[in-house]
Amino acid sequence: MTYAYLNITTPQHNNIFTPPQHNNTSTSYLTTSTSHHNNIFTTPQHNNITHMIYRKLTEDEISTLQANSCWAEDWQRIEVSEDFEPRFFHRVMFYGDIRLGAFTDNVEVSRGFMKHSGVNNATLRNVTIGNNCLIENISGYINNYTIGDDCIISNVCTMETTDGATYGEGNLISVLNEVGEGNLILFHGLTSQVAALMVKHFHNRPLKDTIRRLIREEIERTAPDMAAIGNRVKIVNTKEITNTVIYDDCEIAGAARLSDCTLMSNSNASVYIGTGVICENSIIGDGSSIINSVKMQDCFVGEACK
């Protein structure tokens, strides 16, 4: 199994209040560069799903959807934006509570190749979709997901949020202590400094308990009710995405499985997940690329790692 490696700079000091001297570098099963987060309480910037006013489908809209071979478990549980256009939906099965945005624009699926936004050949259950997304050829289903604006999801088998989802947060791993008790907790605010503090002062029980309590409270405070996909995300030719939060401007092309992960992409430093990648119980920092069939489990990949 291949692991992503992070460089954790270990502070050379005896007192936790002494400024760390970043002179010596140790290698562990994590690799991370220094994050721009200011402290462990920095709230993650989840997708900016457009807040809109929804309404029920009209009888004419239901008739148009049915004429396009769409079916719903209960049409009354589908809510749509004011500018909703049913003619851009074909062969879609709706289950549970559905919310749909406006589908008025074209999207660029490849350089110079434009397709109109809409949903075709898909099964949706308890899904919210933002404006101007293109979702097509979902061979399995999308279940319990919130999808932002201007996304492309094509040729995907399953996307799902299940009970007990962790999104890669709260996992306890061993760093520089492979045969002992886990000494490092993965979470969205992890930095080199916080990691070094947890590892170096692992045997300081009061400090360890306090840090773990603060991290646990932060995870509980920021955990979403269901997995979400940000704006301008592109997911193509991917088999399985389960319990995974995907931030803005991320691209996933040909991945085999993403399970209980957080991809902290943004418009200035996007995350790319390539062909054959299997990633489980991990957090990927902004600007990072995971490619060439990497198999990764219980890892934190820092900013701009490749």
Q: Residue ranges of each PLM-predicted region?
A:
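Domain-scale signature associated with acetyltransferase and cell-envelope carbohydrate enzymes
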Residues: S28-K306
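Compositionally biased, intrinsically disordered low-complexity segments enriched in Pro/Arg/Gln/His
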Residues: L6, P11-N14, P20-N23, H36-N38, ...
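A periodicity- and composition-biased signal for non-globular, repetitive helical segments
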Residues: T18, T27-S28
